[in-house]
Swiss-Prot record:
Induction of the gene: Expressed in the early phase of the viral replicative cycle.
Residues in TFIIS-type zinc fingers: 155-195
Function: Part of the DNA-dependent RNA polymerase which catalyzes the transcription of viral DNA into RNA using the four ribonucleoside triphosphates as substrates. Responsible for the transcription of early, intermediate and late genes. DNA-dependent RNA polymerase associates with the early transcription factor (ETF), itself composed of OPG118 and OPG134, thereby allowing the early genes transcription. Late transcription, and probably also intermediate transcription, require newly synthesized RNA polymerase.
Subcellular location per the Swiss-Prot or TrEMBL entry: Virion; Host cytoplasm
Binding-site residues for Zn(2+), renumbered to this chain: 159, 162, 187, 190
Alphabetical list of InterPro entries matching this protein: RNA_pol_30_chordopoxvir-type (IPR009162), RNA_pol_30_chordopoxvir-type_N (IPR024394), Znf_TFIIS (IPR001222)
Name of protein: DNA-directed RNA polymerase 30 kDa polypeptide
Annotated catalysed reactions: RNA(n) + a ribonucleoside 5'-triphosphate = RNA(n+1) + diphosphate
Molecular function terms, GO-annotated: DNA binding; DNA-directed RNA polymerase activity; zinc ion binding
Pro residues bias (residue ranges): 226-236
Length: 259
């Protein structure tokens, strides 16, 4: 039995991980080569000690059975919620794969930080087998700034009050699918809001050539001093439009005819 010591993020304690196997490196060498072995163990030690959630007991009062399948979730019985002090348990009834049976049995037979360490090892082995990166810290996020650089201030609409470009467009009101929404720009510096610029189109229709020439130019940006738009008006009554005649009871006097 090999004792693997890792340093916790607490300054005054060290966690002793007694892995139930003769040699954890000998077991891992069956799945990964020696070039990835040490890096995988170091990564699993670091992540298991960093993300292990303590002080949550698995009791009947804080365990809730999940409804999703657990056939590919062997060894991950508990997904712990540190905020609400809850544990969500999956029933590990079906083995993941016979290839990892020894490691899965070790996961089921351990607890605490040892279980977390073996879980990270199993995850890393599967990623190495598929040829993908298991360490999320080494994965670079895709930058879409070249395509959607909408947060850059130099492209924002300037504020007509303070001339600042620290503005944000906001959708005030949505309408039907065939109508444009009500959009206003808000300035973070002077706390004013204004209407977005519009395009003024001059249409010159040439009947002989059937061509339309449009000259578009940006109009002046005006501040939005108007009140909020009113609600949609009530539809006209058919009685007021004369489409439906008013009915009367037989005991009422008949209406007078219009002269």
């Amino acid at each position: 039995m090999e004792n693997v010591y890792i340093s916790s993020y607490s300054s005054n304690e060290q966690i002793s991980m007694a892995v139930v196997t003769t040699d954890i490196r000998e077991l891992l060498s069956q799945y990964v080569d020696d070039a990835n072995l040490e890096n995988l163990i170091e990564w699993a030690m670091e992540k298991s000690s960093k993300y292990y959630i303590k002080n949550i007991g698995n009791t009947k009062s804080n365990i809730e059975e999940t409804k999703f399948e657990s056939k590919n979730n062997i060894g991950i019985e508990y997904s712990k919620d540190s905020k609400n002090k809850l544990s969500y348990r999956n029933k590990p009834s079906i083995a993941t794969h016979l290839e990892y049976k020894t490691l899965c049995d070790m996961i089921k037979g351990t607890s605490g930080t040892e279980k977390e360490f073996l879980r990270y090892l199993l995850f890393g082995i599967k990623c190495i087998k598929k040829g993908v990166e298991y360490n999320i810290d080494k994965i670079k996020d895709v930058s879409y700034n070249d395509y959607f650089n909408v947060l850059d201030e130099k492209y924002n609409t300037p504020c007509p009050n303070c001339k600042s470009r620290n503005t944000t467009p906001m959708m005030i009101q949505t309408r039907a699918a065939d109508e444009p929404p009500l959009v206003r720009h808000a300035c973070r510096d002077c706390k004013q809001h204004f209407k977005p610029p519009k395009f003024r189109a001059f249409r010159n229709l040439n009947v002989t050539t059937q061509s339309i020439h449009e000259n578009k130019e940006i109009t002046e940006i005006l501040p939005d001093n108007n009140p909020s738009p009113p609600e949609s008006p009530e539809p006209a009554s058919p009685i007021d439009d004369g489409l439906i005649r008013a009915t009367f009871d037989r005991n009422d006097e008949p209406p007078e005819d219009d002269e």
